[in-house]
From Swiss-Prot:
Residues given in the record as substrate binding sites: D296, N500, Y660
Catalytic activity: a (3S)-3-hydroxyacyl-CoA + NAD(+) = a 3-oxoacyl-CoA + NADH + H(+); a (3S)-3-hydroxyacyl-CoA = a (2E)-enoyl-CoA + H2O; a 4-saturated-(3S)-3-hydroxyacyl-CoA = a (3E)-enoyl-CoA + H2O; (3S)-3-hydroxybutanoyl-CoA = (3R)-3-hydroxybutanoyl-CoA
Protein name: Fatty acid oxidation complex subunit alpha
Similarity remark: In the N-terminal section; belongs to the enoyl-CoA hydratase/isomerase family.
GO MF entries: 3-hydroxybutyryl-CoA epimerase activity; delta(3)-delta(2)-enoyl-CoA isomerase activity; enoyl-CoA hydratase activity; long-chain-3-hydroxyacyl-CoA dehydrogenase activity; NAD+ binding
Positions bound to NAD(+): M324, D343, V400, V401, E402, K407, S429, N453
EC number annotated for this UniProt entry: 4.2.1.17, 5.1.2.3, 5.3.3.8, 1.1.1.35
Cross-referenced PROSITE patterns: 3HCDH
Lineage, uppermost ranks: Bacteria, Pseudomonadati, Pseudomonadota, Gammaproteobacteria, Alteromonadales
Transmembrane portions of the chain: none
Pathway linked to the protein: Lipid metabolism; fatty acid beta-oxidation
Cellular component per GO, a single term: fatty acid beta-oxidation multienzyme complex
Alphabetical keyword list: Fatty acid metabolism, Isomerase, Lipid degradation, Lipid metabolism, Lyase, Multifunctional enzyme, NAD, Oxidoreductase
Gene name, Swiss-Prot/TrEMBL: fadB
Amino acid sequence: MIYQSPTIQVELLEDNIAKLCFNAPGSVNKFDRETLASLDAALDSIKQDSNIKALVLTSSKDTFIVGADITEFLGLFAQDDAVLLSWVEQANAVFNKLEDLPFPTASAIKGFALGGGCETILTTDFRIADTTAKIGLPETKLGIIPGFGGTVRLPRVIGADNALEWITTGKDQRAEDALKVGAVDAVVAPQALEAAAIQMLKDAVAEKLDWQARRNRKLSALTLPKLEAMMSFTTAKGMVFAVAGKHYPAPMAAVSVIEQASTKGRAEALQIEHQAFIKLAKTDVAKALIGIFLNDQFVKGKAKKAGKLAKEVNNAAVLGAGIMGGGIAYQSASKGTPIVMKDIAQPALDLGLNEAAKLLSAQVARGRSTPEKMAKVLNNITPSLDYAAIKHSDVVVEAVVEHPKIKAQVLAEVEGYVSEDAIIASNTSTISINLLAKSMKKPERFCGMHFFNPVHKMPLVEVIRGEHSSEETIASVVAYASKMGKTPIVVNDCPGFFVNRVLFPYFAGFNGLLAEGGDFAAIDKVMEKQFGWPMGPAYLLDVVGLDTGHHAQAVMAEGFPDRMGKSGTDAIDVMFENKRLGQKNGKGFYVYSVDSRGKPKKDVDPTSYGLLKDAFGELKAFEADDIIARTMIPMIIETVRCLEEGIVASPAEADMGLVYGLGFPPFRGGVFRYLDTMGVANFVALADKYAHLGGLYQVTDAMRTLAANNGSYYQA
């Protein structure tokens, strides 16, 4: 053994080829500080052994290296610039040491080689991948750029245009696609991987392959004609900005770094990367996006733990077909859990099956599935008009019409047809789980399971704990949601649960602006372009449906009369009373038509302006800051109330609920990350300026205490 540490082992194979194996104690290899230090020490040991003629990098795991240890980032990035620069330079010195070894090197890549893992393989002269490999630099998704030489080496290996696409999108690349652009030199079967890499090194040692020419290309400036380079980078800037926009600076920074570094040798090029990396690491956007990644890991970790308490779900059922039932059936069946779709009407079953078939056909059309897989998934969906079909179901999801009496009746009926230990969940967005539980003989096996529409696109599922729900019930539904490919958060029962409870104060703020003459299209523009929502409040209400919004608003007003009670007619009432229901009937705040691709197209409608003018008078202009404050303050305070009341368990789960359930702008990180970035004291001062508008604008005592103590919701 040439070198051994808890994360890396180096041994000498036949023909004096050394093998460096990444072998961290956990399930995957990461580039944490310990691994970087071990790699540095391992390379020193390798350099001192004069017998070594070549080096192959391998992994003992199913994956190569998944990237840097992101749990270290927030603490590290909070350091002074000088400390951060020192860390980046030390890390890059290790990668340079690997690249500069006096003999040929190769990487044997299986599974993921992402971020720092990808940057590792770029330092070697040859790269062999097996068919499971996925390679990429996802750093821009975290608000930063590659920091271990990725922006320098990748363009010199695969060309500037390909590197720009890889780095600015942050997407993983399959082995076959990596081969096409020259990121890897060969793709082989998994069992042949190490042997293929070793054979390539033998050929290099025997001078059949010119490894030094390959290395020199990476150490030198890019060989791009000046005019071609200018055209490439100008085009890239336009395309990247069109996608990333002003709120996500990292992709544009990556283009700029690659452009500036293209005429430099390795040392100067790396310095350009270092400076850009440090600048981005200090941004609020990086903090927010890294926070989302960590929160996502936290929420999924909780779901994984729940799996240990969960009852195994081998068969499921959904009651109520149609679009929602079909979406739930598709999601369950496509992830491997057979499901019965039960309804009282054949047309509804047909609609549900058509919805599943439509979603599957789209997967086939995009090359993400095959007709054979589509047929298998459809065979996993059993439509039925008879309750007898659900008797073997481990979990039954009730998804009938949103009416408490109908749901209660269906839930009571279901208990008579399923086994004693079957779990029953209601897909409701507004009806109290405790209320529905009263219709059941065994309320301990009942909880809420709130899917968001469209089911196949929205990642969040709210699992609602009623006062009688058992831990096994909650754990089982959480595990089932995870198995369906969803991100579940557990919330306690209250009107609106978590997501709708915090959404409707936002709509109340919007209604307040319109009642004073606000222009809904101008408000939408501010909330989309400046705050960063995917759609503004008027457009969102049209998509949700103004009938749904009207009903949910009434539920919230009844549940929280002090803050959400209404004293008169608001804009939602005006639209609803004039049968303007939004996209579903072609007219709401906006009017809708179908574009050439068959997608809904919205236009401003003078009729809706006329109705609002009749109700609230002439239009009045509001400043953008005023619009943001009046819509967001109520949502933020209500989110904090949910945490304080224990409706949601942690800031992390609340923020993921907002990002995954409502599309809260990821670059802001969620309400609690936004509060920490803004400063709780600054928010309290802002809210106090609007406190005269009512209870929705009045901060809690706990918020005032936190502000006075200069506290924060996250610890890093």
